[in-house]
UniProtKB/Swiss-Prot annotation:
Cited CDD domains: DOPA_deC_like (cd06450)
Residues reported to bind substrate: 81, 194
Record note on what altering residue 49 to V does: In a colorectal cancer sample; somatic mutation
Protein name listed in UniProt: Histidine decarboxylase
Organism listed in the record: Homo sapiens
Length: 662
């Protein structure tokens, strides 16, 4: 058994380990390379009869636990909203866990209750919340409490709203059964609301309707008013609205200034879920999203996300604490005390009875950082997200389908959803960063959240390069396996194919003194302000042609083109007489030497399609190069990406030369 002196020694050892872990976490693989059940084989079938040594236990941290950990504190963890910690927070929980009080009533631990009340008032003022959410204000009958999660807070708010509405209905229908009254209740949220809102409706047996949002993914007053009127005509009783500030999918903000007056007029409980974005309201410049907050009956957010107070720690405020108490009050004799009814007993503000001393770590963090440093932390995360957004916008292969808010950027690879899905799969293989998908308007998107307080521009650039490399590989594979039939038509009509047939070398594209535009042209490029009209090529209006980057995204390309595309790329790489190092898909090798020369210019002029003539000169077995063989080819040999295209037109073509050159 461990004694105090050994605990002191082992405690130092553990603190050293934690410091080492958090200081070097960016060097670890973010996601583990394990399969479900990996731990079973590493543990004995039964618990030990005799105690293990601490050295054995401590050694198993790296041997057993860390190989299966997702490192949420890594700067390369971008999948979910943050779940940050900090040194003061860790110290706070160390003390709270040592005290280990269960502060269900004031009498069970006065410091637990009173510190929480004061810290929650601090936090409400820091966020700019209304005075009716304060414990200590002459005109307030509300206050704040720390819950375990926003999910639990939303359920508590819905249960309180349900109880209050049923009591109102009982005044006009005193003989009605409460279950019958409950069956008529209906609540509302946007279709972007968190899944916990749906779960709250299931638990409370209240119908939950998810309303459509506008083009900015925001729930507006018109949609809510229409739903209320329709439900009233059906005999339903509207009771509750959950407005989201910072949705999970795209960090959108519902319009409180429109929803609030409707809720006040119709007698609906307005609950605000600001789980992630709530921390941003520490900064005055982000409080525009709080316009209409005075109508809120309850408000919740997670300091355990972005405020560097580790899980669990959720702030929850109500305008009227008595509506909570009438919902959750049970008062057996063994929980009564001399100050019952005078002091605050938080057991009446929540579902469980027992509660942790969570306010210590929150108190430590606020005092250790101060408001100014917490604001600087939020601004830094937002600036890092802006930097990532700029990188995405400067790459024409990607698009940003929703406006960036705070530290979340959503983006996708242009084209069908399968491309974005495959990019995510490719990134997941290496585990060097962690991203997850979401969907908006049937489009698959990637969520990129700046999570760590230690994230730097170098971290962002490193992760962006990994994303772009994965996208380049996926686009190359897609163009190989599913070329668009329009690509071949364009190649046969535009004279750039003639340059290929004549054996144009890489050196003619990038050599000193050569004009890249003379060697090849882009099928279509973005039109700059003030730019002149596009040129005509072989009778074609180039501005009417589709962007080659978009043209390669056909999901229903004929199979007959696959072998020709593969063979052409193989031959193109094989005919270079003078080797030149180019950026490759998977290595820095150079193209292989030619086995046969390309046809001369004279032979090209003798009639027929130039594309057919090119392919006719190669051996039949080369023409039948399979998809699997081409994958091996691009694994071992360089495929040029011709980056100088971007310097001429601003369009970085991610695909093969077949799309890029004419």
């Amino acid at each position: 058994m461990m004694e105090p002196e050994e605990y002191r020694e082992r405690g130092r050892e553990m603190v050293d380990y934690i410091c080492q872990y958090l200081s070097t976490v960016r060097e670890r693989r973010v996601t583990p390379d394990v399969q479900p059940g990996y731990l079973r084989a590493q543990l004995p079938e039964s618990a030990p009869e005799d105690p293990d040594s601490w050295d054995s236990i401590f050694g198993d941290i790296e041997r057993i636990i860390m190989p299966g950990v997702v490192h949420w504190q890594s700067p390369h963890m971008h999948a979910y909203y943050p779940a940050l910690t900090s040194w003061p927070s860790l110290l706070g929980d160390m003390l709270a866990d040592a005290i280990n009080c269960l502060g269900f009533t004031w009498a069970s631990s006065p410091a637990c209750t009173e510190l929480e009340m004061n810290v929650m008032d601090w936090l409400a003022k820091m966020l700019g919340l209304p005075e009716h959410f304060l414990h200590h204000h002459p005109s307030s009958q509300g206050g704040g409490v720390l819950q375990s999660t926003v999910s639990e807070s939303t359920l508590i708010a819905l249960l309180a709203a349900r109880k209050n509405k049923i009591l109102e209905m009982k005044t006009s229908e005193p003989d009605a059964d409460e279950s019958c009254l409950n069956a008529r209740l209906v609540a509302y949220a946007s279709d972007q609301a968190h899944s916990s809102v749906e779960k709250a409706g299931l638990i409370s047996l209240v119908k939950m309707k998810f309303l459509p949002v506008d083009d900015n993914f925001s729930l507006r007053g018109e949609a809510l008013q229409k739903a209320i009127e329709e439900d009233k005509q059906r005999g339903l009783v509207p009771v509750f609205v959950c407005a989201t500030l910072g949705t999970t999918g795209v960090c959108a903000f519902d319009c409180l200034s429109e929803l609030g007056p409707i809720c006040a007029r119709e007698g609906l409980w307005l609950h605000i879920d600001a789980a992630y974005a709530g921390t941003a309201f520490l900064c005055p410049e982000f409080r525009g999203f709080l316009k209409g907050i005075e109508y809120a009956d309850s408000f919740t957010f997670n300091p355990s996300k972005w405020m560097m107070v580790h899980f669990d720690c959720t702030g929850f405020w109500v305008k009227d604490k008595y509506k909570l108490q009438q919902t959750f009050s049970v008062n057996p004799i063994y929980l009564r005390h001399a100050n019952s009814g005078v002091a605050t007993d938080f057991m009446h503000w929540q579902i469980p009875l027992s509660r942790r001393f969570r306010s210590v770590k929150l108190w430590f963090v606020i005092r250790s950082f101060g408001v100014k440093n917490l604001q600087a932390h939020v601004r830094h995360g937002t600036e890092m997200a802006k930097y990532f957004e700029s990188l995405v916008r400067n790459d024409p292969s990607f698009e940003i389908p929703a406006k960036r808010h705070l530290g979340l950027v959503v983006f996708r690879l242009k084209g069908p959803n399968c491309l974005t899905e495959n990019v995510l799969k490719e990134i997941a293989k290496a585990g060097r960063l962690f991203l997850i998908p979401a969907t908006i308007q049937d489009k698959l998107i990637i969520r990129f959240t700046v999570t760590s307080q230690f994230t730097t521009r170098d971290d962002i650039l490193r992760d962006w390069n990994l994303i772009r490399d994965a996208a380049t590989l996926i686009l190359s594979q897609h163009c190989t396996s599913q070329p668009s039939p329009r690509v071949g038509n364009l190649i046969s009509q535009i004279r750039g194919a003639r340059a290929w047939a004549c054996g144009t070398s890489l050196q003619s594209v990038s050599g000193a003194g050569d004009d890249p535009v003379q060697a090849r042209k882009i099928i279509k490029q973005p039109q700059r302000v003030g730019a002149g009209p596009m040129k005509r090529e072989n009778g074609l209006h180039l501005e009417t042609l589709l962007d080659p980057v978009d043209d390669c995204f056909s999901e229903e390309a004929p199979d007959a083109t696959k072998h020709k595309l593969s063979s052409f790329l193989f031959s193109y790489l094989s005919v270079q007489t003078k080797k030149k190092t180019v950026r490759s898909l998977s290595c820095n090798s150079v193209p292989v030497s030619a086995q046969k020369p390309l046809p001369t210019e004279a032979s090209v002029k003798n009639g027929g399609s130039s594309r057919v003539r090119i392919f006719s000169r190669f051996p039949e077995d080369m023409m039948m190069l399979k998809k699997s063989a081409f994958k091996k080819l691009i694994k071992f040999y360089s495929v040029p990406s011709f980056p100088e295209c971007s310097s001429q037109c601003g369009l970085q073509l991610p695909c093969c030369p077949l799309q890029a050159m004419v």
